[in-house]
C-alpha cells in the first residue's frame, strides 16, 4: 500500500513552498521518517531517500552554516528524486538553495509551524494507519458508550437489526456487513467501513438504510478501535453458556487479541439491551469493578459463615 503526497496534504495542514502535479502524486511507502542529521554532515552510508525527509532545528541550524554552492550541492544529495516530500518544521526559514534543490528533483517542499517531535509523531501515526494492511471481516462495528464493539454471528441472526436498534438508542454506527480491520499499532486494532457501504445498514425486508440521513451525523462514525467482540449465536439448551462472566474468551485479529462475549439469541430476548449491558460490564471491569468477583466473594463469605454456624 502507499499514500500519495496529495493525501498527506489533504489530512495534515502544511504551508506549500513548492509543488507540481507530478510531485503531488509521488507515493509514500513507509511510515518511518528520516531526519537527515548525519547526511547534512556528509555521511550518506545509511541514507534512505524513499522516506519523508524532516528538517528540525538541528538539521536546519547546521544547513545554515554551510554557505554558497556547498549548501546547494549538499541539499541535492539529501533531496533525491526518490524522496516523496521534504518538510521543514517550526516555521523555520527556507533558503533559496532548498527551493532550487526541490525544483531540480521535482519534490514537494512543505513548511509546518509544529514542533519537530510533535510533527514526527503526527506523521508516523497518520502513515501507520493509512499504510496498515487491511483484513475484511463480517459483522457490524459500533461505538457503544465510547467502546468499539464488533458484533458478529451467523448470517441472518440479526446483527444488522441489533445495530439499527442500538443506533436508535443513541449509539454510533461505524460499519455494517463488511468491516475493514487493520492494526493501528502493536496492541490496537481498528476498523472502518468499505467506502461504498459507509453510513449504510442493510435490513432484510426493508433494504438499504442511510443511517446518516435518517438519524443525523451524530449516529455515524468514520472508524473506531475494536475493544471487544460480541458474538451472537442461536440459543441451544444443550450448550453450556457462561453464566457468571468469569470465563472470558479471546479472539485474535492480525496478531492482536480482543476479548469476546458470546450472547445466546432466542425469541423474547432484547438483544440490543443485552449488548449494552455487556459493554457497560466490560467498561466497569476496565475501571476495576467486577460484579463476578463481588458475587464470588459474597458466596465465599456465606459458605464460611454457614460452616461456622454448624
From Swiss-Prot:
It catalyses: [HPr protein]-L-serine + ATP = [HPr protein]-O-phospho-L-serine + ADP + H(+); [HPr protein]-O-phospho-L-serine + phosphate + H(+) = [HPr protein]-L-serine + diphosphate. Its EC number is 2.7.11.-, 2.7.4.-. Disulfide bonds: none annotated. The active site is at residues 138, 159, 177, 243. Residues 201-210 are annotated as: Important for the catalytic mechanism of both phosphorylation and dephosphorylation. It holds the Pfam family Hpr_kinase_C. Mg(2+) binds at residues 160, 202. Residues 264-269 are annotated as: Important for the catalytic mechanism of dephosphorylation. The keyword rRNA processing does not apply. CDD domains: HprK_C. GO terms for molecular function: ATP binding; magnesium ion binding; phosphorelay sensor kinase activity; protein serine/threonine kinase activity; protein serine/threonine/tyrosine kinase activity. The Walker A ATP-binding motif also binds Pi and PPi. Both phosphorylation and phosphorolysis are carried out by the same active site and suggest a common mechanism for both reactions. Homohexamer. SUPFAM superfamilies: HprK N-terminal domain-like (SSF75138), PEP carboxykinase-like (SSF53795). ATP binds at residues 153-160. Its cofactor is Mg(2+). The gene is hprK. Catalyzes the ATP- as well as the pyrophosphate-dependent phosphorylation of a specific serine residue in HPr, a phosphocarrier protein of the phosphoenolpyruvate-dependent sugar phosphotransferase system (PTS). HprK/P also catalyzes the pyrophosphate-producing, inorganic phosphate-dependent dephosphorylation (phosphorolysis) of seryl-phosphorylated HPr (P-Ser-HPr). Keywords: ATP-binding, Carbohydrate metabolism, Kinase, Magnesium, Metal-binding, Multifunctional enzyme, Nucleotide-binding, Serine/threonine-protein kinase, Transferase. GO terms for biological process: regulation of carbohydrate metabolic process. Belongs to the HPrK/P family. It comes from the Bacteria. It comes from Lactococcus lactis subsp. cremoris (strain SK11). This is HPr kinase/phosphorylase. InterPro entries: HPr(Ser)_kin/Pase (IPR003755), Hpr_kin/Pase_C (IPR011104), Hpr_kin/Pase_Hpr_N (IPR011126), P-loop_NTPase (IPR027417), Ser_kin/Pase_Hpr-like_N_sf (IPR028979). The keyword Kinase applies.
Amino acid at each position: 500500500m502507499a499514500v500519495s503526497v496529495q493525501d498527506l496534504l489533504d489530512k495534515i495542514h502544511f504551508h506549500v513552498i513548492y509543488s507540481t502535479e507530478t510531485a503531488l502524486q509521488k507515493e509514500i511507502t513507509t511510515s518511518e521518517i528520516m531526519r537527515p542529521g548525519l547526511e547534512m554532515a556528509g555521511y550518506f552510508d545509511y541514507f534512505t531517500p524513499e522516506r519523508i525527509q524532516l528538517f528540525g532545528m538541528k538539521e536546519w541550524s547546521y544547513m545554515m552554516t554551510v554557505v554558497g554552492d556547498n549548501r546547494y550541492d549538499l541539499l541535492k544529495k539529501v533531496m533525491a528524486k526518490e524522496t516523496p516530500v521534504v518538510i521543514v518544521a517550526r516555521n523555520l526559514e527556507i533558503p533559496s538553495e532548498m527551493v532550487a534543490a526541490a525544483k531540480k528533483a521535482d519534490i514537494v517542499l512543505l513548511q509546518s509551524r509544529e514542533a519537530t517531535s510533535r510533527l514526527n509523531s503526527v506523521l508516523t501515526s497518520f502513515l501507520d494507519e493509512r499504510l496498515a494492511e487491511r483484513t475484511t471481516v463480517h459483522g457490524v462495528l459500533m461505538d457503544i458508550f465510547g467502546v468499539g464493539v464488533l458484533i458478529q454471528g451467523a448470517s441472518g441472526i440479526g446483527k444488522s437489526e441489533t445495530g439499527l436498534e442500538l443506533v436508535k438508542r443513541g449509539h454510533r454506527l461505524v460499519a455494517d456487513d463488511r468491516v475493514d480491520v487493520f492494526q493501528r499499532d502493536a496492541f490496537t486494532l481498528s476498523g472502518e467501513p468499505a467506502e461504498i457501504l459507509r453510513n449504510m445498514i442493510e435490513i432484510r425486508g426493508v433494504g438499504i438504510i442511510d443511517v446518516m440521513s435518517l438519524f443525523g451525523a451524530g449516529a455515524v462514525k468514520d472508524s473506531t478501535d475494536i475493544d471487544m467482540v460480541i458474538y451472537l449465536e442461536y440459543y441451544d439448551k444443550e450448550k453450556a453458556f457462561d453464566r457468571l462472566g468469569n470465563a472470558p474468551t479471546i479472539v485474535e485479529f492480525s496478531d492482536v487479541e480482543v476479548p469476546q462475549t458470546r450472547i445466546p439469541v432466542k425469541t423474547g430476548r432484547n438483544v440490543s439491551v443485552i449488548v449494552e449491558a455487556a459493554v457497560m460490564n466490560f467498561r466497569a471491569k476496565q475501571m476495576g469493578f467486577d460484579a463476578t468477583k463481588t458475587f464470588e466473594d459474597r458466596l465465599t463469605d456465606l459458605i464460611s459463615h454457614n460452616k461456622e454456624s454448624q
